[in-house]
Amino acid sequence: MTEPRYWDDYEVGQKFPLGSTTFTEQEIVDFARQFDPQPFHIDAEAAKQSMYGGIIASGWHVASKMMRLFVDNYVDRRTALGSPGLDELRWLKPVRGGDTLTGTVICAA
């Protein structure tokens, strides 16, 4: 186990790798059925006719999986202080079954 991290231990520009996560079409559909049941997330035929041309992950599913990487690979449970929130969250490109995303935390301020 590494040493606990406190606010004073961080330096601007520090990078912390979070690892990777791969999405499957089934988990995309399962998540969306429960939390974001829009046709392009849950219905293959409707999704084909959409601007995306197929099933895509809910942005909230993507955010949730990235949060899991963050907690598993970055948060020190001994010194966790909660989160002050997010300043910006954007989904720039659709995520599909088979896609793998990799996260990195960069200390900005």
Regions found by a protein language model. Give the residues of each.
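Hot-dog-fold acyl-thioester-processing enzymes
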Residues: M1-G85
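Hydrophobic beta-sheet segments that form the core/acyl-binding groove
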Residues: G85-A109
